[in-house]
Regions:
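Soluble non-cytosolic domains of exported or imported proteins
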Residues: 37-41, 100-101, 162-166
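Short Gly/Thr-rich strand-loop-strand
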Residues: 60, 103-145
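A short acidic-to-branched-hydrophobic micro-motif
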Residues: 79-101
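Extracellularly exposed regions in secreted/surface proteins, prominently low-complexity, repeat-rich
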Residues: 131-180
Length: 180
């Protein structure tokens, strides 16, 4: 009886010491990667929940050097637009692995451009910066964007219809959930 109790207690204690973070076979933490395709149902649904009728909008990107889009593609990432194309309402989500310290280089640029550090509520990100809420460009179009680093993947969410962090969180979470 004592032996059985000792084994049971040991198993309970060992189970309590385990982690839910996946590990690779070599004992290192498993690396998450950006999605390979833009047709991420969870992301499409997150946009549709805020802008009824949203869908993935195939886009023929022509990235210019020095832009976030260019850097995403250089890092082997993808950029995807979701929304209602004819109404010109929607947003773009970009994913890229943090290769060659990409995040630190980009973060320096973003801070110099006026983005500010933020801690996203309910998200366990490594780092995040946001384009100030309610920013407008020269033509008065509303602009809102957030950049975050999570599990060594850079995610950028930008949209014309978002006004604040709370509105963006479901889309941000869907972008995180699409990592594999």
């Amino acid at each position: 009886m004592r032996k059985t109790l000792a084994v049971a207690v040991s198993l309970i204690l060992l189970t309590g010491c385990s982690t839910s973070t996946p590990e690779a076979s070599d004992g290192k933490m498993a690396q998450l990667t950006p999605p390979a395709s833009c047709e991420q149902e969870i992301v499409i649904q997150a946009f549709a929940d805020q802008v009824n009728g949203s869908r993935y909008v195939p886009t023929d990107w022509q990235p210019s050097p020095g832009t976030d889009l260019f850097d995403v593609y250089e890092a082997g990432g993808i950029a995807c637009t979701y929304g209602i194309q004819v109404a010109e309402i929607g947003g773009t989500v970009m994913w890229a692995s943090n290769v060659d310290n990409l995040w630190d280089r980009k973060k320096t640029e973003w801070l110099e451009q006026g983005q500010v550090q933020i801690d996203l509520p309910g998200i366990n990100e490594t780092d995040a910066v946001i384009l100030k809420e309610g920013s407008t460009s020269a033509d008065e179009m509303h602009v809102w964007a957030i950049n975050l680093l999570i599990n060594d993947v850079w995610i950028q969410v930008g949209a014309t219809f978002l006004q604040n962090v709370d509105e963006a969180l479901p889309i941000v979470q869907s972008a995180i959930d699409s990592l594999s």
